Curated annotation (Swiss-Prot):
pH dependence of function: Optimum pH is 7.
Family, as annotated: Belongs to the FTR family.
GO molecular function: formylmethanofuran-tetrahydromethanopterin N-formyltransferase activity
Organism phylogeny: Bacteria, Pseudomonadati, Pseudomonadota, Alphaproteobacteria, Hyphomicrobiales
Protein known as: Formyltransferase/hydrolase complex subunit D
Length: 311
């Protein structure tokens, strides 16, 4: 393998290794975009990594009233877990504690898929026997079941069940090697904006960016993951460092999506956006994280992402 350049920036001839995950989507609506976003922001908090948070979540899109089941402003949220049962547990907890509790919200299924997850059908028990089931047609005329749960500002309307998809992928990634922190952060921010514009893809870390990239295991017994020392600039003098002398900071983006194709397109968009402005911000190189191809079956080779994203 030989490295190559894109927009004058070195790109390592490597691949990002990603994993099969369970994924779902919900639509949260409210009377105003502000309150729909408040609910979505709270629900997707503490959801950067499945390992430490139980789920990975993010906001996929803001929706106009024409795009939602009840004709109000909305937000589409994506949620990912290791497997369907863990995903169900996180979905119920987060909707119950963050969407049910928020003034004015309603909650609907946001994606079709083969696996059913009871949502309103489980949360209805909060209604203490006063919740009422109702069937209403969707935009295609298909009857769907909802629960009207009495709450102090009226009622919480929640779809009886949502769906989990087959083919969701977690862990697409890019690493940006830069000279200075402020400049590299700008590059990563531009990459995030491009990546999250792809429908069905989210970047779950703070602002879409992670500084604490990890490797599997560690020196301490029982650690599932520890700092990726090969990419820590303060350890450049040690054997095993993967960083060139001029690199002073590394920032990573991680992408989860409902399909493998969405991960690839999100990575492509991020790679091109970052390298287009990289030279003026001291970007040294772009690479990706993998485990030698031994853990995840999805391999996204950076060489395959050279073609520009569709306009």
């Amino acid at each position: 393998m030989s490295d190559f350049t894109l927009n004058g920036i070195k790109v390592e001839d490597t691949f990002a290794e990603a994993f099969d995950v369970a994924g779902t989507a919900i639509i949260v609506t409210n009377d105003t975009p502000k309150w729909a976003m408040i609910a979505a922001t709270v629900m997707t908090g503490f959801a950067t990594s499945v390992i430490g948070c139980g789920a990975e979540a993010g906001i996929d899109a803001e929706l106009s009233p024409d795009e939602t089941p009840d004709g109000r402003p909305g937000v589409r949220i994506l949620l990912f877990g290791f497997e369907p049962n863990g995903l169900k547990d996180q979905l119920l907890k987060r909707v119950g504690q963050c969407i049910l509790t928020c003034p004015g919200t309603a909650c609907f299924a946001g994606v079709e898929g083969p696996t059913k997850i009871k949502l309103g059908g489980a949360i209805r028990y909060f209604g203490d026997g006063f919740a009422v089931a109702k069937r209403l047609p969707d935009h295609e005329g298909k009857m769907r079941r909802y629960w009207r749960i009495p709450v102090m500002d009226g009622e919480f309307l929640c779809e009886d069940s949502v769906r989990a998809v087959d083919g969701a992928v977690g862990g697409g990634n890019l690493l940006f090697l830069g000279r200075k922190h402020a400049d590299t952060l700008i590059v990563a921010e531009i990459a995030v904006e491009a990546a999250k514009a792809i429908p069905g893809a989210i970047l779950p870390f703070p602002g879409g960016i992670v500084r604490s990239g990890s490797k599997v295991g560690g020196r301490t017994k029982g650690m599932m993951a520890s700092t990726n020392d090969a990419y820590c600039p303060t350890l450049k003098g040690r054997a095993g460092s993967a960083l060139p002398p001029e690199c002073g900071v590394v920032l990573e983006i991680v992408i989860d999506a409902l399909t493998s194709a969405a991960v690839a397109e999100s990575m492509r968009a991020a790679l091109h956006a970052a390298t287009e402005i990289g030279a003026q911000h001291g970007l040294v190189a772009v690479t990706a994280g993998n485990y030698g191809g031994n853990l995840g079956r999805h391999h996204y080779h950076l060489r395959d992402l050279l073609e520009k994203p569709a306009a």
